[in-house]
C-alpha cells in the first residue's frame, strides 16, 4: 500500500514543480522552448476543460468531478485486496495525476499545460487542427496508469488460486 501513496505523492510533486517552472519561464507571452525541432516544444497553456480542452462542466463542476474521481480511486484501492505492484503503480499514477490537476483547479481555476508534441498543425476540411493537445506531467501519469490497466489487466485483476 505504501507504493500506491508514494507514487501518488511523487507524481503530484513532480507535476507541481514542472508546472511552477512552466508558469515562471513560459507564461506572459514567452516564446516556446524547442526541445526537438519540428517535434517537441514547451508551450504555456491554461486549460479550463479536461482532456483535449473539452469543456462539459463549469470549472467548479470539474473541480468536484476531479475530487470525486480521486476519492474513488483511494476508496477502490483500499477496498480491493489486490496488492500487486502493477495494481498499486497504475492506480498510484492515476491518483497522483488527479491530485496534480486538482491542485491547479483549486489554486488557479484552470490546469496548466505545457508539453506539446507538434505532430501536425494545419487544417482538415477547412477546420483548424492540432493533432495533439498540449498536456502536462499529471496528464501523462493518468494516461500511463490507465494504459497499464488496459495492457496488464489480466495480471492486475486475476486472482491467484492456491
UniProtKB/Swiss-Prot annotation:
Pathway where this protein functions: Protein modification; lipoprotein biosynthesis (signal peptide cleavage)
Example of a GO MF term: aspartic-type endopeptidase activity
A GO biological-process term: proteolysis
GO cellular component: plasma membrane
Active site (UniProt): 113, 139
Membrane-spanning segments: 56-76, 84-104, 132-152
Coiled-coil ranges (or none): none
Enzyme Commission designation: 3.4.23.36
UniProt keyword terms in alphabetical order: Aspartyl protease, Cell inner membrane, Cell membrane, Hydrolase, Membrane, Protease, Transmembrane, Transmembrane helix
Domain of life assignment: Bacteria
Membrane topology summary: Multi-pass membrane protein
Signal peptide span: none
InterPro entries, A to Z: Peptidase_A8
Catalytic activity: Release of signal peptides from bacterial membrane prolipoproteins. Hydrolyzes -Xaa-Yaa-Zaa-|-(S,diacylglyceryl)Cys-, in which Xaa is hydrophobic (preferably Leu), and Yaa (Ala or Ser) and Zaa (Gly or Ala) have small, neutral side chains
Pfam family, one: Peptidase_A8
Localization annotation: Cell inner membrane
Its job: This protein specifically catalyzes the removal of signal peptides from prolipoproteins.
Family: Belongs to the peptidase A8 family.
NCBIfam families assigned to the protein according to its UniProt record, in alphabetical order: lspA (TIGR00077), PRK14787.1 (NF011368)
Entry protein name: Lipoprotein signal peptidase
Source organism: Chlorobaculum tepidum (strain ATCC 49652 / DSM 12025 / NBRC 103806 / TLS) (Chlorobium tepidum)
Lineage, top ranks: Bacteria, Pseudomonadati, Chlorobiota, Chlorobiia, Chlorobiales
Annotated gene: lspA
Amino acid at each position: 500500500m505504501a507504493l500506491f501513496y508514494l507514487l501518488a505523492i511523487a507524481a503530484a510533486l513532480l507535476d507541481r514543480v514542472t508546472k511552477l517552472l512552466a508558469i515562471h519561464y513560459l507564461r506572459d507571452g514567452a516564446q516556446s522552448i524547442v526541445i526537438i525541432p519540428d517535434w517537441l516544444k514547451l508551450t504555456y497553456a491554461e486549460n479550463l476543460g479536461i482532456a483535449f480542452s473539452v469543456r462539459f462542466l463549469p470549472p467548479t463542476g470539474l473541480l468536484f468531478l476531479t475530487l470525486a474521481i480521486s476519492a474513488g480511486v483511494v476508496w477502490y484501492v483500499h477496498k480491493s485486496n489486490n496488492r500487486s505492484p502493477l495494481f498499486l503503480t497504475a492506480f498510484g499514477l492515476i491518483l497522483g495525476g488527479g491530485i496534480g490537476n486538482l491542485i491547479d483547479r483549486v489554486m488557479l481555476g484552470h490546469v496548466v499545460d505545457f508539453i506539446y508534441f507538434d505532430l501536425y498543425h494545419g487544417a482538415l476540411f477547412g477546420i483548424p487542427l492540432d493533432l495533439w493537445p498540449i498536456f502536462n506531467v499529471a496528464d501523462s501519469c493518468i494516461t500511463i496508469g490507465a494504459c497499464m490497466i488496459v495492457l496488464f489487466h489480466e495480471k492486475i485483476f486475476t486472482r491467484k488460486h492456491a
